[in-house]
Amino acid sequence: ETDNIESFQLNKNTKTIIYEKSQKVSSIKYNTLKVPCGKTFNINLSDGTNVYLNSGTSIKFPVSFKKESDREVFLSGEAYFNVQTNNASRFVVKSNLSSAIVFGTKFNFKDYPEDSFSEIILTEGSLGVRKLENTEKDKLVIIKPGERAKVSFETGEINRSRVNTKIYTSWIEGRIVFRNENLENM
């Protein structure tokens, strides 16, 4: 059983959509939001999770999450998630190759179609990363705040490393930060 969304509110000044709960329905309905190149957008999902969407990003999400089951969204591009804690259900972000499994945390998930990898940068909390075509026996890589999990499209390997999270999340504030980067990487 799910909470039906009776309406949503669009705030043009803050570029935010806020969904409001009302009555219950039995099936999950999905919306897809595509952010044009050169723009960013913010959306508050029905469970209270806040998502900042970067330029050229697409997200598919349920109008309302089904109670006591995984809260799944599907991402192509880059987004920063501030996940609302819910002990009864995990929050799962799925992309082309990988997925992030969280309970309540803040992280950046990047998976543009033209990249040869996806990466998840954790700023707060804890989360697990695994390949998308996973089976339960596939290893779940746990990352901690200040760490990045990088999933290779070619090999499916997940590499973990320490990073300065501000470099990866500065786009939320409209800034671009470069530190010791080659011109070809920019």
Question: What are these regions, as identified by a protein language model?
Answer:
Residues 1-186:
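A residue-level detector for the "anchor" residue at the start of short, highly conserved motifs
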